[in-house]
Amino acid sequence: TYNGDHMSMYGVNAGVPKTLVKYLVQWVAKNGVDEESKATLLDIVDTPISPELIPADENGDIKQKTEDLVGPYELHDFFLYYFLRFGFRPSKIYYLANIAFGGVYDEETIKKWLSTFFRRFFNQQFKRSCLPDGPKVGSISISPRGDWRMPSDASFAMWLKEIENL
């Protein structure tokens, strides 16, 4: 949701990949809180990520699970890391992903989500261009005031063409 992350004066988790957020919450639950808080945090970790503004279905179940639409976050974080940290082309990222996730995802699934990643990464740049200040936590950052410079109207066409030729 555009503007949801932009309303705050400081983006505390902007530099933390989604997969790392889950592990951080698990660590805090197991190492730093009382039993009641631990149960709450572990329940949050076990809940699929979804847009919180969409109401549950008639059975109280989550109607829209984000990973069903955009793909597994572990793949997206992998793609993001190798794209930003090393500047690898889609073909090299695809090759590495097939090695890293070979027993988990087949080649077509990796290709599908790699294509989705690049399309969304380029199409959503306008959201990153106006992020509030935030910390750089790891070795990569998508903050426009830090490591990442990209025009909001950049085209992803050459990236998708390379993926189509895999």
What is the predicted role of each segment?
Residues 1-166:
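ATP/NTP-dependent adenylation/nucleotidyl-transfer catalytic domains that generate, transfer
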